[in-house]
C-alpha cells in the first residue's frame, strides 16, 4: 500500500511544475480519476477486515483527496490568472468595449450521480465491468432465468433489432445484468463488480424514459449469504445520501435471476413516505448453472438501481424528463463543476 505522504509529496512536486491547464488536467486524472493513484488506494478499503482500520484508512484517503483537490484548484486559478495577464499584456485593450461574460460548462446531474455512485462502490472493492448495448436474447433473458413466455420478452416491452447472433434475436439490452453474464463467462470466481451503463425499454412517461441508466452489482464467492447483501445495501445507501439516519426496509419480491428476492424502500425521516429505490436478492442457482459455476461451492448476491432515480432523490428533481431535454438553464441550475470530485469516503464512518 503506497504511503499517503509519499503520494501527496509526489502530487505537489508534479503540480508545481505545471505550466498550462492541459497538463494540469492530465495530472488531475492521474491522481483523482477513476483509475488514478488515489482512487486505486481507495479501492483497497474493501480488503480491510478490521472496521477501525477501514475507518482510519478511509479518513486518511479522504483527507489526501481534499488536499490534492485544493492544490489542483489553486494551481488552475494561478494558471488562468497568468494566461489572462499575458493576454492583456500582448493585446491592445479598448476600454470602451463591453466585457464578455465568462461561460463555463457544467457536469450533467446524471454524470455527477453516476460518478458518486461508482465512488461509493469502489470503497467496497468493487471493480467496473462494461458490455455492449446491443445484446442477443441469451445474455439478456435466457441466461438470467427468464422463461420463454415472460412478459419482458414481448415486443411492447423490448426494442428488438433486425438480425441474429448465433441464431439468437438481437435487441437493445433492457438491463445491465447482461454484463454480469459476460463477465462471469469470461472469468472465474470469486467476482465483485458493478456494471454501470445505458439500458433501453419501450416506455415513456413522467417516471419512465425509453433510455435510462442503471448500475447493477454482483458478488460471487464462497459462503455468501443475505447478511452480506443487507450490509452492502444499507452501508451504500447511507453513504451515498450522507445520512446515517436513513431507514431501510427489505420487502419480499420476485425477480427471475434471484431467489430470494427483495425490493428496498427508504425514508429520510420517520414521518416520510417509503420510497422504492432498488431491487436485490441472492443469485438464482439456475443463473450459476447457465454459466457453468458450481452451485454447491459458490453463492452470491446481485442488486440493481436506476441512476436517474437516485439523482432525483438526492438533487430534489421532480420530473425525469428534464434530464433529457437539454435545457442549458436547467443544467446550469445544478452547476456541477469539472473539479467537483465526488468525495464520500466520510459517509462510511458516520
UniProtKB/Swiss-Prot annotation:
Catalyzed reactions per annotation: tRNA(Phe) + L-phenylalanine + ATP = L-phenylalanyl-tRNA(Phe) + AMP + diphosphate + H(+)
E.C. no: 6.1.1.20
CC cofactor note: Binds 2 magnesium ions per tetramer.
Keywords noted in UniProt: Aminoacyl-tRNA synthetase, ATP-binding, Cytoplasm, Ligase, Magnesium, Metal-binding, Nucleotide-binding, Protein biosynthesis
UniProt GO BP: phenylalanyl-tRNA aminoacylation
List of residues binding Mg(2+): 259
A Pfam family per the record: tRNA-synt_2d
Localization annotation: Cytoplasm
One GO CC term on file: cytoplasm
Main location: cytoplasm
A GO MF term: tRNA binding
Required cofactor names: Mg(2+)
Subunit structure: Tetramer of two alpha and two beta subunits.
Family as reported in the entry's similarity comment: Belongs to the class-II aminoacyl-tRNA synthetase family. Phe-tRNA synthetase alpha subunit type 1 subfamily.
NCBIfam families associated with the record: pheS (TIGR00468)
Protein name: Phenylalanine--tRNA ligase alpha subunit
Organism this protein belongs to: Rickettsia prowazekii (strain Madrid E)
Taxon lineage: Bacteria, Pseudomonadati, Pseudomonadota, Alphaproteobacteria, Rickettsiales
Amino acid at each position: 500500500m503506497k504511503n499517503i505522504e509519499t503520494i501527496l509529496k509526489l502530487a505537489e512536486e508534479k503540480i508545481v511544475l505545471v505550466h498550462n491547464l492541459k497538463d494540469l488536467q492530465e495530472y488531475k486524472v492521474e491522481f483523482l480519476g477513476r483509475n488514478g493513484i488515489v482512487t486505486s488506494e481507495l479501492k483497497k478499503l474493501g480488503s480491510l477486515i478490521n472496521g477501525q482500520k477501514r475507518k482510519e484508512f478511509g479518513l486518511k484517503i479522504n483527507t489526501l483527496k481534499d488536499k490534492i483537490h485544493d492544490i489542483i484548484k489553486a494551481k488552475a486559478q494561478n494558471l488562468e490568472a497568468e494566461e489572462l495577464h499575458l493576454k492583456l499584456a500582448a493585446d491592445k485593450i479598448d476600454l470602451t468595449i463591453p466585457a464578455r461574460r465568462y461561460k463555463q460548462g457544467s457536469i450533467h446531474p446524471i454524470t455527477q450521480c453516476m460518478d458518486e455512485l461508482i465512488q461509493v462502490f469502489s470503497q467496497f472493492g468493487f471493480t467496473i465491468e462494461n458490455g455492449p448495448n446491443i445484446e442477443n436474447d441469451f445474455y439478456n433473458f435466457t441466461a438470467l432465468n427468464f422463461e420463454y413466455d415472460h412478459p419482458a420478452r414481448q415486443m411492447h416491452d423490448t426494442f428488438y433489432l433486425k438480425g441474429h447472433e448465433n441464431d439468437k434475436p438481437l435487441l437493445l439490452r433492457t438491463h445491465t445484468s447482461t454484463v454480469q453474464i459476460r463477465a462471469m463467462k469470461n472469468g472465474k470466481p470469486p467476482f465483485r463488480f458493478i456494471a454501470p451503463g445505458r439500458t433501453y425499454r419501450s416506455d415513456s412517461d413522467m417516471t419512465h424514459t425509453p433510455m435510462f441508466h442503471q448500475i447493477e452489482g454482483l458478488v460471487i464467492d464462497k459462503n455468501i449469504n443475505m447478511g452480506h447483501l443487507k450490509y452492502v445495501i444499507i452501508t451504500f445507501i447511507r453513504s451515498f445520501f450522507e445520512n446515517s439516519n436513513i431507514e431501510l426496509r427489505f420487502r419480499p419480491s420476485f425477480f427471475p435471476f434471484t431467489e430470494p428476492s427483495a425490493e428496498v424502500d427508504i425514508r429520510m425521516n420517520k414521518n416520510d413516505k417509503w420510497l422504492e429505490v432498488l431491487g436485490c436478492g441472492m443469485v438464482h442457482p439456475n443463473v450459476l448453472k447457465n454459466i457453468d459455476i458450481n452451485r454447491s461451492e459458490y453463492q452470491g448476491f446481485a442488486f440493481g438501481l436506476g441512476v436517474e432515480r437516485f439523482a432525483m432523490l438526492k438533487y430534489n428533481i421532480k420530473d425525469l424528463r428534464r434530464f433529457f431535454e437539454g435545457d442549458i438553464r436547467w443544467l446550469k441550475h445544478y452547476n456541477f463543476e469539472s473539479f467537483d470530485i465526488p468525495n464520500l469516503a466520510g459517509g462510511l464512518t458516520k
